[in-house]
């Protein structure tokens, strides 16, 4: 039963984050929430390591500031005890030029006393950076002209 409840809690939190209800999402997190999303923060400033509601609020707000539309599709979700893993396909529309970025991510949620206490996120950052910069980094790194 705890598994199905935590599964639904994650889906509710994701719905709130993607809809822009950041305060509603944060209310479902512990005060000392720990969010880890390894990535080059010079290009993806909302990624990295964030501790506490204030830092996570700033992270989620940065994502909304950069994108005019956000949505996701759940590819898979697994819950066991106080942990939930979810595989998402994410679609973000850049506010600057209307281009749509699409990528897959895996997120791992830990719960304490019914609230999210930790989120670990894994993304193919090479692909995401290419989409953010709108450049073929493979060609650049290999010395080939970009297509």
Predicted regions and their residues:
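Short, low-complexity N-terminal intrinsically disordered segments enriched in polar/charged residues
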Residues: 1-31, 137-147
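A beta-strand edge to alpha-helix "cap/lid" segment located at domain peripheries
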Residues: 1-5, 64-147
């Amino acid at each position: 039963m705890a598994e199905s409840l935590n599964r639904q809690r994650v889906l509710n939190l994701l719905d709130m984050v993607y809809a822009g209800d950041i305060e509603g999402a944060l209310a479902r997190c512990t005060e000392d929430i720990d969010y880890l999303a390894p990535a080059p923060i010079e290009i993806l400033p909302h990624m990295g390591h964030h501790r506490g509601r204030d830092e996570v609020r700033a992270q989620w707000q940065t994502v909304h500031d950069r994108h005019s539309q956000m949505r996701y599709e759940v590819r898979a979700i697994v819950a066991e005890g106080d942990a939930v893993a979810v595989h998402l396909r994410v679609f973000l529309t850049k506010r600057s030029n209307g281009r749509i970025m699409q990528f897959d991510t895996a997120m791992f949620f830990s719960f304490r006393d019914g609230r999210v206490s930790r989120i670990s996120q894994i993304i193919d950052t090479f692909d995401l950076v290419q989409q953010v910069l709108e450049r073929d980094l493979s060609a650049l790194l290999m010395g080939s002209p970009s297509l």
